[in-house]
Regions:
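Short, loop-centered acidic/histidine patches that primarily coordinate divalent metals
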Residues: 178, 197-200, 234
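Flexible, gly/pro- and Lys/Arg-enriched active-site loops
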Residues: 187-226
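Conserved histidine-centered catalytic loops in small-molecule metabolism enzymes
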Residues: 131, 214-257
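A short acidic, often aromatic-flanked loop/helix-cap motif at beta-alpha or helix-coil junctions
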Residues: 8-14, 108, 152-157, 235-239
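Short gly/pro/ser/thr-enriched loop/turn and capping motifs at secondary-structure boundaries
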Residues: 10-11, 79, 108-110, 133-134, ...
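Active-site-proximal cofactor/substrate-binding loop regions of enzyme domains
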Residues: 1-6
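Active-site ligand-binding patch in enzyme domains
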Residues: 17-38, 42-171, 180-183, 253, ...
Length: 257
């Protein structure tokens, strides 16, 4: 009997990348996801970001939210946008929504925010460095789960947070943070995949936000490079996907946004 090995090996690995990563490391597979214009802006100089991409790209994002276990943002995103972070696909119920994770080192998330008010219906985790149980209680009573991490540069220790999430059985996280949290995730070396939705628009603006902020790199040679890149057309927009060649751990201070 003749046996052929490694048939469609790369395709199978890609299809099961979350499972393989979680089984080998017991840590979530983290996808850094953002939408930007052709000139690299995630919002206008006024902060307006609805919508950067078109309907096809946004529908793809919600299919991703339906597929992966959790979605994570920083408290800055909650304060700026008051998002629900749900899966808005036709025919889906609350059970299809991802677990929502907020990185909030000092517990600034408003109790009246949509996320906290819906925490009893949709699983919600607040990751914080604040150890004051009295400050935890209003969130717990609202239905949130509190995870306390060590403090790293004044912010949530993302590596420790991933360890705790893995222990809870969360095998995958879509990171939809702002530029500072995205930089922190790259700095912590927790990102396994990058998904950039690129719109056929130009926003301009010196003060307009970009997908990755923080300190930045000194030279192009220091940059995080992606391998196994793939480009997919989504209506008038594009999805560019790739995998960081190596984890960078000396990239400046951690931040949340």
């Amino acid at each position: 009997m003749e046996v052929t090995e490694h048939v469609l090996e790369k395709e199978c690995d890609a299809e099961n990348e979350v499972f393989f990563h979680y089984m080998q490391t017991k840590l979530p597979f983290v996808i850094l996801k953002y939408a930007m214009t052709l000139d690299g802006k995630i919002a206008t100089y006024t902060g307006a970001s609805r919508w950067v991409t078109g309907e096809a790209a946004r529908a793809h994002v919600h299919r991703m939210r339906n597929r992966y276990r959790a979605i994570m943002v920083g408290v800055g995103t909650v304060l700026a946008d008051d998002p629900m972070l749900t899966c808005r696909l036709k025919g889906t119920e609350n059970g299809a929504n991802p677990v929502r994770i907020i990185c909030d080192s000092t517990l600034r998330t408003p109790l009246e925010s949509q996320i906290v008010r819906s925490a009893k219906e949709i699983p919600t985790i607040l990751a914080t460095c604040n150890r004051q149980e009295a400050m935890h209680m209003p969130y717990i009573e609202a239905g949130c789960k509190i995870l306390v991490t060590p403090e790293k540069d004044g912010h949530v220790d993302l590596s420790d947070l991933m360890r705790q999430l893995g222990q809870l059985g969360i095998d995958s996280v879509i990171l939809e943070g702002g530029g500072t949290l995205n930089w922190s995730a790259l700095q912590a070396g927790i990102v396994q995949k990058v998904q950039a939705y690129v719109a056929s628009k130009l926003f301009g603006g010196t003060e307009a936000k970009t997908p990755v902020e923080g300190q930045g790199f000194h030279t192009p040679a220091d940059a995080v490079e992606l391998t196994r890149t793939k480009i997919t057309a989504l209506g008038s927009d594009w999805l560019i996907e790739g995998y960081p060649v190596e984890n960078r751990r000396n990239m400046g201070c951690l931040q949340e946004s």
